[in-house]
């Protein structure tokens, strides 16, 4: 893990969650491993993000449509979204609180000759002066310690007129059955304990937090 001692950092970084994902770090790029569901889901996520960004910024170019877009991928893991965003032309900065995840992601991107700025940090601690056109918070808010403070910190990094994506698991009986009972206990796609249902969020709760941080909620999907 990153050597972070600042007290405010601990209000978003959940050590238990970081240790959990650090143990699985070597499997990020194994399409048949513990992150198989993410690999299957990834093409949909990439297409969704790309199309939303193109529409939001009224981009006309078909070739590398995200060229010169400053993008921040928060909780990047092994870089499963960072790399495709880079290939689409975005200038990618990707952060994760697990040093092991950052090492795996950096190694993989260098192997594929992709220029991605990987940093082991969190949104409230990131030592960077610029702001971003696009911020990705994909399947991360259910793993942080203080969602209000986390999203407030993310908002400070977003340019005026920028767009932030927040994806998480809805707090429903269906999500408990599929994401925890099914994926962890029956199919064994994910290690038991990967998700905690208490940390799942209902859309209205997430919208409330975002509005509190002066974000305009454009669309809720899923």
What are these regions (language model features)?
Residues 168, 188-205:
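Acceptor-substrate binding/catalytic loop of class I
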Residues 60-64, 69-176, 203:
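Conserved SAM-binding loop
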Residues 197-214, 220:
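Short alpha-helix
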Residues 53, 57, 109, 210:
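Conserved hydrophobic residues forming the short capping helix/wall of the S-adenosyl-L-methionine
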Residues 172-194:
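Alpha-helical membrane-targeting segments
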Residues 40-67:
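Conserved alpha-helix/loop element of class I SAM-dependent methyltransferases that forms part
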Residues 8-35:
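N-terminal, positively charged/glycine-rich alpha-helical extensions of SAM-dependent methyltransferases
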């Amino acid at each position: 893990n990153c050597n972070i001692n600042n007290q405010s950092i601990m209000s978003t970084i959940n050590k238990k969650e970081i240790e959990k994902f650090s143990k699985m770090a070597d499997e990020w790029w194994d399409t048949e491993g513990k992150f198989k569901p993410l690999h299957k889901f990834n093409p949909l996520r990439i297409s969704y993000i790309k199309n939303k960004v193109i529409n939001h910024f009224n981009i006309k170019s078909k070739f590398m449509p995200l060229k010169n877009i400053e993008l921040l991928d928060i909780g990047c893991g092994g870089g499963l979204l960072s790399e495709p965003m880079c290939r689409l032309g975005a200038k990618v900065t990707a952060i994760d609180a697990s040093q092991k995840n950052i090492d795996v992601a950096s190694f993989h991107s260098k192997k594929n000759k992709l220029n991605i700025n990987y940093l082991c940090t969190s949104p409230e601690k990131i030592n960077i002066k610029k702001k971003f056109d696009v911020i990705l918070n994909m399947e991360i808010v259910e793993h942080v310690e203080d969602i209000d403070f986390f999203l407030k910190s993310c908002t400070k990094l977003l340019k005026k007129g920028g767009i932030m994506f927040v994806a998480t698991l809805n707090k429903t009986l269906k999500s408990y059955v599929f994401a925890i009972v099914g994926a962890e206990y029956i199919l064994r796609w994910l290690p038991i304990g990967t998700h905690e249902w208490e940390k799942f969020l209902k859309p209205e709760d997430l919208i409330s937090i975002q509005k509190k941080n002066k974000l305009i909620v454009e669309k809720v999907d899923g």
